[in-house]
Amino acid sequence: MLLYGDYHTHTTYSRHNHGKGSVLENASVAADKGLKQIAITDHGFNHEFFGIRRRQIPQLQEDILNAKEITGVDILLGVEANIISLDGEVDVKEEDYEFLDILLMGYHKCVHTSSMKDKALLCWANNFGNPFRPSKERLNRNTTAFLKALDKYPIDVITHLNYGFPTDTIAVAKMAKQKGVYVELNGKRICFTEEEIEIMTAEGVKFIVNSDAHRPERVGEVNNGMNLIYKYNIPLSQVVNIDKLPKFHKKRGN
């Protein structure tokens, strides 16, 4: 059982020293660990502190080409987009698709939202609310925002679902399956109940195991997800980057 690729890794393009290593360092570790492919998926453009800047994309593209040539690892350019409105907007524009090989989407606390209402009900309500016992209204708002995002954008992976942003897991997972989106088993945190894992598996939801590495040495470290696969007997046919390379939505020219 081999991990073919790690599709959630951060570099120094996640600003303010949030990501610790370069593209080349991430790729070198991936090569040493036998990975065939990785994605560089720094924080989205609207993150208040850690987001990559669009003006940095040409240099990132150059870094990726250089690292590919040196290491032989295939490297995808992506972003971990942020949900920024109750209406399911995320911080990517249509013109961004021209450089994106992969699009991840998740919730993060400190983002520039579309309006003050979105800041209050999306960010503040979740940042300061009880993460374990959300009100029905908050749960419904969060779930609806995710469902709308999945319907609007060519998202490939939902990252760390429910972390700081509780949702109706099964509703989101069913929509993800319908849209060909993978649910991440995150290398740092997995916020699912045993029942939710069993239902998602029975429903045929596709999973992807990623490290969420913020340091080069963490690239390819997916024991958290692998242990869950073993524990709940998730069929490997439902894990898209074990013993195979996953397919992602076509974005260029959309």
Specify the residue positions occupied by each region the protein language model found.
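Short, solvent-exposed loop/turn segments at secondary-structure boundaries
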Residues: 15-20, 49-54, 219-221
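Charged catalytic cores and adjacent phosphate/nucleic-acid-binding surfaces used
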Residues: 1-12, 23-24, 92-95, 115, ...
